[in-house]
């Protein structure tokens, strides 16, 4: 019974992730109406769990030796940076969208928006961790497309405000991710 439930959950995660590429407008529109608790429990946190396992195993493959302290330090630094980025980006987006675009969202709704966009970065990170070519990191640029589409589908901004919103969101998203990753790399790794 539990195995079937887990299998269905991960099948739904894969389907949701694929829909971000296949029909991003529909995916982001449905994300607007999603229940925040369901999103976190059945999509984002399980995806983080898979990411943590991938970091651990990927680092084990790269090291070639089983050094638990090094594996945990690396995995926890990367995972902590991702989670902190998730919350900081959500808070920043909520504040900036309310202040500059008169769009008020709860933190939970903004976490859904950021979570869907960040899931692309998570999957790219998993692929790179397993020695796929580093050029796959360019897939992270798809986040720009999602931010552009999200300004229409999720945030429902007027056409003339979309470009300003997207540029600000790109700067905030990548800036926070870079700063947090830099901080954790210097602090822990």
Language model feature labels by segment:
Residues 30-37, 113-116, 129, 157:
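Membrane-interface junctions
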Residues 2-105:
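Selected alpha-helical membrane-embedding segments in polytopic membrane proteins
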Residues 56-69, 123-131, 180, 184:
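Transmembrane helix-loop junctions in multi-pass membrane proteins
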Residues 37-51, 113-117, 121, 163-170:
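Alpha-helical membrane-anchoring segments
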Residues 53, 89-94, 120, 144-148, ...:
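Alpha-helical transmembrane segments of polytopic integral membrane proteins
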Residues 81, 85, 108-147:
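Alpha-helical transmembrane segments of helical membrane proteins, especially in multi-pass transport
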Residues 127-189:
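Terminal transmembrane helical module of multi-pass membrane proteins
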